[in-house]
């Protein structure tokens, strides 16, 4: 993964995991990613997420290593490789539990995630110009001076900010 746009990398990893119908995935950590995941969890797009620091990382690594050795499934080896790769320096892995609306068909709660504000073109919106996503059925994730929130919360609090992504 590139370090040019870590948020876009996280969104791509989530979309790829949904297409593979995985139950969870690992991404490298950052404070902004954690705030975005809080919003996604609160809005019901993901089940949960957890930061794997210290003992939690050791337990998860041990469990994945055992599963990778026992299972012929290549997914387990991929998960183990991601865990090792993302636990470097001050970073730690984040485990994201995906949410599926229909367990049999594996229909995801996330239809699509689109990164709006990018490195070369930042997109800002005021209270009056805050975008509606899919006529109110989706959300816009907005970074304001009061923190990362949805477009609905930003309108309610009368805050503008950088539009990070659209999710529906």
From Swiss-Prot:
Region span, Not found in other S8 sequences: 59-93
Gene Ontology annotations of biological process type: translation
GO molecular function: rRNA binding; structural constituent of ribosome
Signal peptide from the UniProt entry: none
Keyword tags: Ribonucleoprotein, Ribosomal protein, RNA-binding, rRNA-binding
One GO cellular component term noted in the UniProt record for this chain: cytosolic small ribosomal subunit
Domain of life: Bacteria
HAMAP family: Ribosomal_uS8_B
Assembly mode: Part of the 30S ribosomal subunit. Contacts proteins S5 and S12.
Protein name according to UniProt: Small ribosomal subunit protein uS8
Organism of derivation: Aquifex aeolicus (strain VF5)
